[in-house]
Amino acid sequence: MFGVTDDYAKIIMKKLFLTLFVAFATAVLLWACSSSNRVVRFPLVGASNTRMLVFEKVELTDTATVLTVRGFNDPEHWIKVSPSIHLVAQNKEYELIGSKGVEPGKELFMPEDGDSCFTLIFEPLPNACSEFDFIDADAKNGWRMYGIDLTGKMDVANPTGLPRELKYTSKEASDTPEYAYTFGETTVNIHLMGYREGCVTDMVFPVNSMFEGQRSIDVEIDPATGTGSVTFMQYGTGCAFPVVNGCGYGQFFIAPNETVDLYVNLAYINQTLQYNYENYKNLAIKGCWTKGSVYDALNNQDSEDVIVLPDSLLIEEFIRYDMTADEFTGALIDFYRAVCEHAHAQKSGSWAKEICKADAFNTCLIFLNQDFRRW
């Protein structure tokens, strides 16, 4: 009797072993297939010289690298994909071999919403590739997008190059220093995080102050290091805006007589563009940080506390050229109320909400005191 039971147990063990072996082999096979065929949605971009493109999807197979691209411009304007555009990964170039929805070398005119979608097909990238660059080197101002991440591990809140001590600041608005009613020489040392040679064509530095209004300061960036420095006379606390390649990278406050290090996150622009497509994600990342200013705590709020307005809450969505004075005033009030409601609905600190509302109020004042039809 026991002998029969032992034989039966051996049969059961063999069947169990065979089942486990088949399951393991299947898992290995599936893993091998998936390792050579990957899909990355909305990959993060380390640095870019354009705000006309967002990569909606990257598909990596053994035969091709397929990019689903969103292209932007004003309605009835166009963009052009160069036939010489290529990818760069691990110091090797991968050529364009096909396209859908766009013909390389010819204008692609924008629809009424200014948002187009097309597909670019390149030679296959290596399986071990963790990032790649998207380069049009032949055109003078051709697209250059660097460090396109394929791992999903890029730290959007703390980019490479950001000093450790700037990664945490208070969220309490009571820590804000008073307005500085003084004057003196201010120096701002600029560090472009994620910089690659060729990704920055120009940088300007608009500064707003109570006594001088707005003035713009040109910044010369060292092409080898991505750093620069500006010195200027300042009257009272100012609000400054780093503008790289015509795109704003946030704002920060500075006081006269300060020497401040400014860290600009070049990944900011492309990531905020993704906000239009992935509203379920928190893409309200920061554009810049400061070190050495009395306003550091205010300038360096956590990335999740920076409130980015969706396109539906931009001032242009509320006003029209043909409005009467009363209609125009009412539209500005509606704009301010809508922004306040949006700010209060966010899970952000008190600073972020107050700054968001103050920015909206300031926008209303600007439009009330200037003829926006001339803009």
Placement of each model-derived feature along the sequence:
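Short, flexible beta-strand-to-coil junctions
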Residues: 138, 246, 362-366
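Extended amphipathic alpha-helical segments with heptad-repeat/coiled-coil character used for oligomerization
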Residues: 356-375
